[in-house]
Amino acid sequence: MYDVAIVGGGPAGLSAAMYAGRLKLKTLVLTKERGGTITTTNDIANWPGIKKIEGMALAKQLEEHALDYSDVEIKDAMVVGVKKKDDNFVITTQSGEYEAKTVVLAAGTEVRKLGIPGEQEFSGKGVHYCALCDGFFYKDKTIAVIGGSDSAAKEALVLTQWAKKIYIIYRKEKIRAEPVNLDKVEKSDKIEIINNTNVTEIKGKEHADTLVLDKEYNGSKELKVDGVFIEIGRVPGTVLVKDVGVKLNEKGEVIINRKSETNVPGFFAAGDITDCFFKQAIVASSEGVTAAYSAYVYLQKG
């Protein structure tokens, strides 16, 4: 029996584990990906006290800090469900079950799919969701980034180190990047923005090579590319808790209060899976610490 089981090993989960360890709680972290989505980030430049650090390096530091405490255990396991058992919780993974007095859900988010013809067919064969992971395959190639968020802008900027030409295709008037990233995009001689345009299909033979657009660009509704990176946001991984009765908002995010508490006693949540206003690693880390302390207070009340 663990005092706290933490589902997820990103900044929220690892920060929760670190603080739970400081509080001498018997802690289990269950994660399918140590470090979470920050491991796909090239440079993190908004972590206080560190001007710039690679996502993988920060993830490693967070993990090592958590494991400094002997009460913390990290297991590589995919969680498939969480259920109540009397006053405790049972966490089911693909390889076994674990029981804990409290749970911190920090499972983060999954990539959002476009849901258009060809996307699934060419996944991994010209269709990608992580520039840092797969961009090096496109040295001196022409690629497209679909999306208009700050994340899409950063994906395009990462890809400039390999690709010779990058199209950012966005369905609205102007991409919504942070000013510092928008400035870099607009100054790049490799990046071209196609606004007010949707991609309706991805075509190819053995590999994706053509995007079908809903309006003409340079006289054609077909855009030839060597690959495409889709960055249209992420969806929370809350399917895990459908049996617990945790309240979600209209976006499927876990509703928490300032203490990272949910409506279910003993069940806490932190990070991008919650309804927090600002989805950033540093915010997730803060929520993780809050959730761990709230779990401690809950356990003290007995």
Per-segment meaning from a language model:
Residues 1-3, 76, 139-141, 196, ...:
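Phosphate-coordination loops involved in phosphoryl transfer and adenosine-cofactor binding
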Residues 75-137:
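Glycine/small-residue-rich loop that forms an oxyanion/phosphate-binding "nest" at active or ligand-binding sites
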Residues 110, 115, 121-137, 232-280, ...:
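FAD-site-proximal beta/loop scaffold in flavoenzymes
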Residues 10-11, 109-111, 150-151, 275:
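Residue-level detector of alpha-helix initiation sites
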Residues 2-69, 151-178:
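Beta1-alpha1 glycine-rich phosphate/pyrophosphate-binding loop at the start
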Residues 1-7, 22-25, 210, 214-215, ...:
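Rossmann-like nucleotide/phosphate-binding core characteristic of flavoprotein oxidoreductases
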Residues 2, 25-26, 101-102, 125, ...:
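Nucleotide donor/acceptor-binding cores
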Residues 66-92, 97-100, 161-258, 297-301:
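A Rossmann-like FAD-binding core segment of flavoenzymes
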